[in-house]
């Protein structure tokens, strides 16, 4: 696991440390338990963390998840989790960015945080001259109507966990077995299909950088502009 510490200041002017951890491929249940433990044990002084990782193939159902959105069974496990939202798929080649943040520290409400999460992905796509957008009806980020990133959060004790799942270079076939995020017929896409050649490690680093820029109101100028 690689760790990088970054010091950033929100609009309050105070400096806070954000620790970015690269955790490789991690079982979903292992990561979920670790997030719950971190949030339960954190204090007002605990630095915030961003975890970058991938999961082995797994379907996760949010607290609003309905069984009928799993269209047919497979050998991929289905885990009922505590994030918001419906069912989605995680697998190798999808960048998971888990956000373990003290929302009071950053003076953020849930809607503001969701907009910043969407903004991080939208700005990442802009670095590659790809137009992406969020949706008020179906949180996430879309390119030409196809979903490239899913969002999900759990708020507890004034802090959040879970985060963003960004499709980089993965097998999209398992999405056929579900109504992604509860929407029948919703198309999905990924960075590779959009002509992005940077590998997932580069994309993960840029995604984290863009999210931190959203938190701290900094502007990142895309390379080559």
Curated annotation (Swiss-Prot):
Keywords: Acyltransferase, Cytoplasm, Transferase. The record marks 147 as: Lowers pKa of active site Cys. SUPFAM superfamilies: Class II aaRS and biotin synthetases (SSF55681). Transmembrane segments: none annotated. Its main location: cytoplasm. Residues 44-219 form the BPL/LPL catalytic domain. It catalyses: octanoyl-[ACP] + L-lysyl-[protein] = N(6)-octanoyl-L-lysyl-[protein] + holo-[ACP] + H(+). The keyword Cytoplasm applies. InterPro entries: aa-tRNA-synth_II/BPL/LPL (IPR045864), BPL_LPL_catalytic (IPR004143), Octanoyltransferase (IPR000544), Octanoyltransferase_CS (IPR020605). PROSITE patterns: BPL_LPL_CATALYTIC (PS51733), LIPB (PS01313). The active site is at residue 181. Pfam families: LplA-B_cat. Pathway: Protein modification; protein lipoylation via endogenous pathway; protein N(6)-(lipoyl)lysine from octanoyl-[acyl-carrier-protein]: step 1/2. Catalyzes the transfer of endogenously produced octanoic acid from octanoyl-acyl-carrier-protein onto the lipoyl domains of lipoate-dependent enzymes. Lipoyl-ACP can also act as a substrate although octanoyl-ACP is likely to be the physiological substrate. Belongs to the LipB family. This is Octanoyltransferase. It comes from Nitrosomonas eutropha (strain DSM 101675 / C91 / Nm57). The gene is lipB.
């Amino acid at each position: 696991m690689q760790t990088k510490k970054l010091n950033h200041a929100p609009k309050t002017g105070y400096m806070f440390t954000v620790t970015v951890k690269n955790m490789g491929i991690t079982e979903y249940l292992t990561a979920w338990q670790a997030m719950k433990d971190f949030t339960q044990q954190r204090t007002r002084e605990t630095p915030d963390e961003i975890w970058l990782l991938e999961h082995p193939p797994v379907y996760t159902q949010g607290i609003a998840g309905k069984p009928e959105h799993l269209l047919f069974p497979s050998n991929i496990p289905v885990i009922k989790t505590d994030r918001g939202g419906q069912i989605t798929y995680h697998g190798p080649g999808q960048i998971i960015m888990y956000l373990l943040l003290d929302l009071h520290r950053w003076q953020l409400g849930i809607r503001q945080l969701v907009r910043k999460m969407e903004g991080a992905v939208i700005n990442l796509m802009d670095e590659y001259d790809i137009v992406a957008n969020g949706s008020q009806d179906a949180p996430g980020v879309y390119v030409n109507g196809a979903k490239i990133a899913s969002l999900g959060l759990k708020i507890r004790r004034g802090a959040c966990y879970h985060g963003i799942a960004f499709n980089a270079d993965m097998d999209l076939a398992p999405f056929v077995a579900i109504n992604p995020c509860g929407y029948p017929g919703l198309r999905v896409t990924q960075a590779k299909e959009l002509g992005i050649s940077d590998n997932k490690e580069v994309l993960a680093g840029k995604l984290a950088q863009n999210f931190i820029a959203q938190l701290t109101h900094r502007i990142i100028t895309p390379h080559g502009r």
